């Protein structure tokens, strides 16, 4: 069974990025961090709210992960570990909780959380991601 995956953006800050929550089958799974909304500019903006198909891929940098597909004007939008907005390059970072690192807004325990995400998604090659904004 393909799970329902929702990303709810909770806060958007040009300095600290877009903080959100990822739900799997309507259950809170983890915190997210994306670049701030900068009109969908490649590498520096979060992608627009909406529905997107995500497909499992083998990334040269992040190995086994999921790519958000068919984003207008964008490509290579991945789920991956990272802590601060500078780590995103337009992608979706996952972490256990929100916090601060060196004075920057961050998500914490990202590596372990990404590993848990991929374990939770074992056997699933595609899913639909619904992104909404609640700010």
Residue ranges and their predicted role:
Residues 1-128, 132-135:
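Cell wall/extracellular polymer interaction/catalysis modules
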């Amino acid at each position: 069974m393909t799970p329902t995956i929702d990303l709810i953006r909770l806060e958007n800050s040009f300095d600290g990025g877009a903080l959100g929550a990822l739900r799997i089958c309507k259950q809170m799974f983890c915190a997210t961090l994306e670049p701030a909304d900068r009109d969908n500019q490649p590498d520096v903006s979060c992608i627009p709210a909406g529905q997107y198909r995500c497909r499992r891929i083998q990334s040269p940098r992040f190995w086994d992960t999921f790519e958000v597909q068919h984003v207008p004007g964008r490509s290579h939008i991945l789920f991956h570990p990272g802590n601060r907005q500078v780590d995103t390059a337009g992608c979706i970072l996952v972490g256990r909780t929100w916090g601060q690192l060196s004075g920057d807004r961050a998500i914490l325990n990202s590596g372990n959380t990404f590993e848990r995400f991929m374990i939770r998604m074992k056997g699933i090659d595609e899913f639909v991601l619904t992104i909404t904004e609640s700010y």
